[in-house]
Swiss-Prot record:
Residues 456-489 are annotated as: Disordered. One of its GO terms (cellular component) is cytoplasm. One of its GO terms (molecular function) is guanyl-nucleotide exchange factor activity. InterPro entries: DBL_dom_sf (IPR035899), DH_dom (IPR000219), FYVE_RhoGEF_PH (IPR051092), PH-like_dom_sf (IPR011993), PH_domain (IPR001849). It comes from Caenorhabditis elegans. This is Putative protein tag-52. Residues 54-227 form the DH domain. Pfam families: RhoGEF. PROSITE patterns: DH_2.
Amino acid sequence: MNAGKEFNYYTYQSDSSQGSLQKAPDENTDYFTHKMNSYLPFDMSTLYANQPTEKIQILQEIYDTERTYVKALTIVDEIFIQQLNLWCPKSKKCFRSMFGEISAICKTHQILLESLQCKPIAEVFTKFVPFLKLYTSYASHYPNSLKIFAKLMSRNDFRKALTKIEEDPRVDGKKLQTYLIMPIQRIPRYIMLIQNLMNYSTEKDDMTNLYKALSGMQGLSDQIQSCMTAYENGERLLQIQLNFGLDGHILEPGRVLLKEGMLYKRELNGSANYQETVVFLFNDILLYGIKRISVMPLCKYEPSAILSLRHCIVQLDDIGGSIFIRCGDVGVDFTAYSLGGVTEWYNEICDAIDNAKKLRDTLRKESFKQKSLIFDKGFWQRNRDKLRNMITADMTGNISRVLTRKKPAPKLEESDFLRGQWTTSTIASNQRKRKVATLEDEEEDVFNMLSSPNLSQRKRKATLQENTPSGVGWTASPRSSSFRKRRASTLRNKNADVTDGNNYLSHLVLNDVTMTQPYTGLNAFVGTPKSRTPTDDDYDSDRDYVWTDDEEFVSDDKKIPIRRVASYDEEDRRPRDFSEVRRSVASEPPRRHLAVDDIRKLSYQQRSLEPFNMVTEDDDEDDIIDIKVKGERPRPWWETESAPPAIKNQKSSIIDSIRNSCAIM
C-alpha cells in the first residue's frame, strides 16, 4: 500500500482521548454518499409563495417524487451496474442489453431535478420533453431485459453477486426488478401530476406551457405503448412461424395479429365431415392449419394455406352457420361451435379485408404478393427430399458409389479385369493370374511339340486334342467339331512348318473360340489378328436394318447397319447370351465365396435410406419416395436373402433417431 492510499485509508478524525487511528470509509462509499447527499430536499413554497396551497402541494409532490426517482436511478448506475461488471466480467454484454439506456436517463433527470429548483415547472417540462424520448428505446427493450435477467439467474456467479448487492444497506432492501420497472412507470406519473397541476393554474402563459408539456408527455406515452405493442406482436409472429415450422411468410414488417382461434373446416363436397382447424387472422393475410402430433415442441401445427385478404371473397351462411371464403382457386368453408362465434369471425374478416384494401393504396411494396399459398403434400415432399439428401450425404463412400451407378460405367482396362469386377476376394484374382500364366506355358509347350520334325502324325494329333485351349476366359464354339476336322486334315501334311502353325492358330483357333477378356498373355503367343473388312456375318440382315416410317423399300446402299451387341457383359465380363441366360465358362475356377460385402452394402442402402416413417396415411401411393437408381438391374433372390436380420430390422430405428434430432416439418 503506497503512501497516498495509506493516508486515505486511515484518518485522524478521532477523539482527543483516544490515541489510535480510526478506519476511514472506502473511496467508492465516499463518492456514492456524497452524490446521494447532493440531492437535497427543497421547499417549493419559497419559489411559489403567492400560489394556492393545493398547487404548492402538487409542486412539492413533483419535486419529491423526482428526487426519489433520481436516487433510485443512481443506485442502479453506481452500485448494480458497476458491481455486476466487476464480479461477472464475462456477462458484460448481457448487462448492457439488460440495463439499456438507464445511465443516460439517470443523467437527464439529474439535470431536470436541478432545473426544478430555479425555473418554472411548466417551462422545465416543455424544454425536457424531447430529451425524454430515451424512454421509447428503453420501454421497447424492457421485455427482452426481463428475458435476459431470467437467463442470467440460471448462472451461479450472477446469483451470488446479485444476492450480495441486494443485501447492501445502500440499496434500501429493494430487488433489481423493482428498479428496472421504475422508468416504465414514470411517464404516466408525470401525466397525472401535470393534469392535477392544470386544475389550479390561472395564468395564461402557465396554462399554455403546461398544455404543451402535457401534450408532449401524452405523445411520448403513446409512442412508448406502441413500441411495446410492436415488440410483443413481433414476438408473437415469430412464435407462430416457429409453431408452423416455416422459414418465412409470417414475420414481416407491418404485419399485425388481429385474431386467433379454433374453427371447424367442412368438406366442400357437402359431407358432414368437420376437421378442427387453427386460424390466425392478420391485417393482410389469413393463415389456417391443423394440429399435428410431434415430438418437437415448436412444430405444433401443419400449415394448410395462406390467403391474401385483398383477393378474398367472404360469404356468410346464416342458416347453415358457416363462413365461405374464396381466394383465387382456393375455397374453404369454416364453422364455429356457436353461431355467435361465426358472426364474430365474419365481422373481423370483413373489417380486415376493407382495411387491407384501403391501406394498399398508400403502400409502395406489398408484404404478401401472392393471392394464395397452399402448403400441400408437395411442400412436405420437398422437406422429405431435404431429409433424404442429408441422410445420403452422411453415408459412407461405399453407398455413395452405389448411388452413382446411374452414370455410364467407365471402360475397363486389363488391370481392372484381372482384379475382378464384383469379386471382393483378392485370392480369386491372384488365382486367375496364375491360371493365365500356366496356360501360356502350356501353349508354348504345345507349339514346340507341334513344330518338332521328329513328332509322328498320330502323336501330333493326340497332343493337339489333349491341349485344345480351354481354360479361364475360353469358351468352346458350337462349330468346334467341323473346325477340328479341317485342322486334322491340315496337319496331315508332313511338311508343315512353323509359319503354317502360326497361320493355323491365328485364323482357325481364334474363330473357333470366343475370348471374354480384352487382352491376355495368349495374344503374345498367337499374334494379333489382322484387321479385315466387315462381312455379312457381322450384321443381321433380318433385324438390324432401320426402315423408314412409311415402310417403303430402301435400297441396299441406303440401309443403315447396326453393330451387334458386344459378346461380353460390361459388368462382370462374362459372355453374353441373347436368350438372357448366361452360359457357363469352360473350366472356370470356382468362386471362393459370394460377394457378400457388396450385397450387404446394396441391401443396407436400399433398406435404410427410404424414410418410410415420414409417409402418412393421407399420402397417396404415388407420393411414396422411390430412391431406386435408374437403370439398376433387378436384384436376384440371393442378394435379397443374404442380408442379415440385424440390418433388416435397422430400418425403423435409424429413421426414428433422425426424426428425434431433426425438425424440418
